[in-house]
Amino acid sequence: MASPVTAQLLPLALLLHAAAAAGPSPFRLSPVRVEGRLGQRVELQCEVLLSSAAPGCTWLFQKNEPAARPIFLAYLSRSRTKLAEELDPKQISGQRIQDTLYSLTLHRFRKEEEGYYFCSVVSNSVLYFSAFVPVFLPVKPTTTPAPRPPTQAPITTSQRVSLRPGTCQPSAGSTVEASGLDLSCDIYIWAPLAGTCAFLLLSLVITVICNHRNRRRVCKCPRPVVRAGGKPSPSERYV
C-alpha cells in the first residue's frame, strides 16, 4: 500500500500532467480497453516510449467511483518487483517483459477489480502518466417493455351521464335496434315530460279547490214584495 504522502501527491501529479498528455503519448498500451468476465485472466501491457525514462514502471488503479484516488498496485524494474502489501500474488502479479515493456496480470477477474488501470514512469525528474485502460464487465442490455395499449374504462352506473339529448348513446354491450325503446336514452326524454304533466295537474287541482272555497252562495228563495203602503203583509214577512 502506498504511503499517505504518496496517496495525496498522486492526484496532484495527475492534474499537473494533464497539459502534457495533450501531446504525443509517451506510452503504448495494449489493449486500450478490456471487457472482462468473472474468473477470466486479464493481462495489460505498458510500453514506455521515453528514451530518457528511468528504469522501472509503476502500475496504478483507480475505481469508477466519485472522488476515487489512484491506488498503488506494483512497481516493476530490472532488479525487483514490488507489489502492494495487501495484494495476493496469486490474484495480481506483474513482470518486466523487455527493457521498456511491462505487464500486469489479473489472474481471476473479480467484480471489485472493475475500474481504470494505468502506468507511470519518471524521466528527467518529471512524473509521466499513461492514459487510462478501462476494465469492466459486459454491460447487461436493458430491455424496454413494450407500451401497453390504452384500455377503455368500463361504463358503470355510478358514472355521471350527460342529460343532453345529443350525448345520449346506447349503453355498453347493448345492440342498436331499428325499433323498440332503449330505456337508457328514452328515460331522459320521458322523465322531464312526465314531471311537467304532474306539475300542471297539481296546479289545476289547487286552482279548482281554491275557487270552490271562495265561491259565493246564492239564495234561491224569492224576495218579499213591497206593496203600495210600504209594508209587507203578514203572510209575506217570512219566506
From Swiss-Prot:
Identify the stretch annotated as signal peptide in this record. 1-21
Q: State the name under which the record lists this protein.
A: T-cell surface glycoprotein CD8 alpha chain
Record-level GO cellular component terms = external side of plasma membrane
Its lineage reads: Eukaryota, Metazoa, Chordata, Craniata, Vertebrata
Q: How is it modified after translation?
A: Palmitoylated, but association with CD8B seems to be more important for the enrichment of CD8A in lipid rafts.
What gene name is given for the protein in this entry? CD8A
- Transmembrane portions of the chain: 189-210
Summarize the protein's role: Integral membrane glycoprotein that plays an essential role in the immune response and serves multiple functions in responses against both external and internal offenses. In T-cells, functions primarily as a coreceptor for MHC class I molecule:peptide complex. The antigens presented by class I peptides are derived from cytosolic proteins while class II derived from extracellular proteins. Interacts simultaneously with the T-cell receptor (TCR) and the MHC class I proteins presented by antigen presenting cells (APCs). In turn, recruits the Src kinase LCK to the vicinity of the TCR-CD3 complex.
Membrane topology (Cytoplasmic):
211-239
Do the record's keywords include Glycoprotein?
yes
Extracellular topology ranges? 22-188
Ranges for domain Ig-like V-type? 25-139
Lipid-substituted positions (S-palmitoyl cysteine): 210
Pfam families reported for this sequence: V-set
Q: List localization entries.
A: Cell membrane
Report the superkingdom from the record.
Eukaryota
Q: Name one GO biological process term.
A: cytotoxic T cell differentiation
Q: How does it assemble?
A: Forms disulfide-linked heterodimers with CD8B at the cell surface. Also forms homodimers in several cell types including NK-cells or peripheral blood T-lymphocytes. Interacts with the MHC class I HLA-A/B2M dimer. Interacts with LCK in a zinc-dependent manner.
Which residues pair up as cystines?
A: 46-119
Topology versus the membrane? Single-pass type I membrane protein
- Keywords of this entry: Adaptive immunity, Cell membrane, Disulfide bond, Glycoprotein, Immunity, Immunoglobulin domain, Lipoprotein, Membrane, Palmitate, Signal, Transmembrane, Transmembrane helix
